[in-house]
Amino acid sequence: MHINYISVGNRLLPLSFQCAAGEKVYVAGPNGSGKSTLLSAIAGTLSSREGVKGEVLINETSLLTLPLAEQAIYRAYLCQQSRPAFNVDVFQMLALSLPVGRHVAEPEVQAAVRRVVELVQMQDKLHRSVQALSGGEWQRVRLAAVCLQVWRSLNPYSQLLILDEPAAPLDVAQAKWLYQLIDEMAAQGLVVIVANHDLNRVYQHADKVLLLNQGVLTAYGSADEVMSVENLQQVFETPVKKVAVDGQPYLIFT
């Protein structure tokens, strides 16, 4: 996938990067650095009236030139937390998220739904109204739904999953399920782009990191390359140390 000179007015200055199928790309940066703007621009939810320029190429398909309904064949996008717009049960919400126009055998559909529901641990909530869910439960339903849209066995054309701060409403245990879900989607061959404030998660989980500051691309590459002490101190304006605990690298902000 190629992102070429994507920009949004003065909120996001032109930037370009490439990523390969199956890569997990994490977008990091301070509040107001342009993370959500970048993700919504890639997802095609911003219009040219909002100053969006550039292109998103997926296997030579120019994503942003397609109508939103056609874009949804190739990519799924989870914006930041929102409440349910209408009252349905969880299983109905998931059914609404299944790809349309695909002739997939019912056992395959059931297997995909069962796997996603297991990954987000919502087996006992399928017949509960979405209006009765807690914030963390609703976020897990949203995650399951957006993944079903681009689940490879249901939608062989899917290429990209975009998640904007998906861990924000989740507790520690629920966040663990989220990262397992991200791994599952990447293993299916999708590019997964995630905005995340938890820099230790970014450092430990990302294949590539895109570091933004005030709408400008500061660095892009492997986690070790991008999340250097020098880069992090420059962008976040706070002292940083790297330590290892039981062989696992961690960042400490002092």
Swiss-Prot record:
Keyword list, A-Z: ATP-binding, Cell inner membrane, Cell membrane, Membrane, Nucleotide-binding, Translocase, Transport
Membrane topology: Peripheral membrane protein
Classification via Gene3D superfamilies: P-loop containing nucleotide triphosphate hydrolases
One Gene Ontology cellular component: plasma membrane
Signal peptide boundaries: none
Pfam families in alphabetical order: ABC_tran (PF00005)
Binding-site residues for ATP, renumbered to this chain: 29-36
Reactions performed catalytically: an R-cob(III)alamin(out) + ATP + H2O = an R-cob(III)alamin(in) + ADP + phosphate + H(+)
Main subcellular localisation: membrane
Alphabetized GO MF terms: ABC-type vitamin B12 transporter activity; ATP binding; ATP hydrolysis activity
E.C. no: 7.6.2.8
Domain ABC transporter: 3-239
PANTHER family the UniProt entry points to: METAL TRANSPORT SYSTEM ATP-BINDING PROTEIN TM_0124-RELATED (PTHR42734), VITAMIN B12 IMPORT ATP-BINDING PROTEIN BTUD (PTHR42734:SF18)
Subunit field text: The complex is composed of two ATP-binding proteins (BtuD), two transmembrane proteins (BtuC) and a solute-binding protein (BtuF).
Family named by the database record: Belongs to the ABC transporter superfamily. Vitamin B12 importer (TC 3.A.1.13.1) family.
Task of the protein: Part of the ABC transporter complex BtuCDF involved in vitamin B12 import. Responsible for energy coupling to the transport system.
Identification of the protein by name: Vitamin B12 import ATP-binding protein BtuD
Gene: btuD
